[in-house]
């Protein structure tokens, strides 16, 4: 009878060991699936973050370029206005003299 109990006990231990192996295997599979899911989510978040940073950078760069262009145009306009004022002040006396001469001269 002890041999039957021993055989039954051994069989029960083997069955328990197989069940434990299945449980461990299922746990490993679940762990790997969770790790893969976490990795995929992390990669997605990194890509979204990278895209957002790239968009912010492009916005900043284009804004800086527009500001620089506007400042450059303002500076060029100021220089041209100054040049025109200087040119007009140099010739304005001659133009006034020419107009006065033209208006006061009578045709014969």
Curated annotation (Swiss-Prot):
Modified residues (N-acetylmethionine): 1
Record's subcellular location: Vacuole membrane
Pfam family, one: V-ATPase_G
Transmembrane annotation, as ranges: none
Membrane-related topology note: Peripheral membrane protein
Organism superkingdom: Eukaryota
Single GO cellular component term: vacuolar proton-transporting V-type ATPase complex
Keyword annotations: Acetylation, Coiled coil, Hydrogen ion transport, Ion transport, Membrane, Transport, Vacuole
Keyword GTP-binding: no
Coiled-coil boundaries: 7-97
GO molecular function: proton-transporting ATPase activity, rotational mechanism
Protein family membership: Belongs to the V-ATPase G subunit family.
PANTHER family: V-TYPE PROTON ATPASE SUBUNIT G3, VACUOLAR ATP SYNTHASE SUBUNIT G
NCBIfam families linked to this entry: V_ATP_synt_G
The protein, known as: V-type proton ATPase subunit G3
Species: Arabidopsis thaliana
Gene that specifies this protein: VHA-G3
